[in-house]
């Protein structure tokens, strides 16, 4: 996972749903650097959502798992320091989804950062004919690349 760019970060979120503009929120955020060093890894209590059954079926994060945690606001300064000032390359699978949620939560993203969407890279290399959809799940990409995928 190493990179020639020490300011490249990889990120992933888990959320209460698919639409931040409709009130869905971030449940967890993980950020690692180009050498695999963990920079940030936290779960959050949503500010407004009380349940998310469809998302829970996918991400396995229940309301009980996060009910005693703090909201993302408590970590926003740290998140903005990493994504707004340190990171000049941001990599993720369907990363526009993650960045949309982060911005909706109030995070500042370096406007000059290069955004690398590995889902788009996968679809460019392997096409999207398997499902006919724009979105290809990470599990499908892992399977196609021969990775022994087990869901969290």
Residue ranges of each PLM-predicted region?
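Short alpha-helix plus adjacent loop in nuclease-associated cores
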Residues: 116-136
């Amino acid at each position: 996972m190493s990179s020639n760019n020490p300011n490249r970060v990889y990120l992933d979120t888990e959320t209460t749903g698919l639409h931040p503009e409709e009130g869905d929120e971030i449940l967890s955020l993980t950020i690692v650097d180009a050498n695999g060093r963990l920079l940030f890894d936290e779960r959050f209590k949503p500010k407004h959502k009380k349940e998310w059954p469809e998302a829970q079926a996918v991400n396995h994060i229940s309301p009980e798992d996060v009910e005693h945690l703090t909201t993302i606001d408590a970590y926003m300064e740290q998140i903005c320091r990493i994504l707004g000032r340190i990171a000049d390359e941001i990599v993720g699978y369907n990363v526009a989804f993650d960045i949309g949620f982060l911005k909706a939560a109030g995070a500042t993203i370096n406007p000059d950062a290069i955004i690398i969407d590995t889902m788009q890279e996968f679809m460019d290399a392997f096409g999207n004919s398997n499902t006919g959809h724009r979105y290809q799940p990470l599990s499908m990409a892992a399977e196609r690349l021969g990775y022994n995928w087990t869901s969290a």
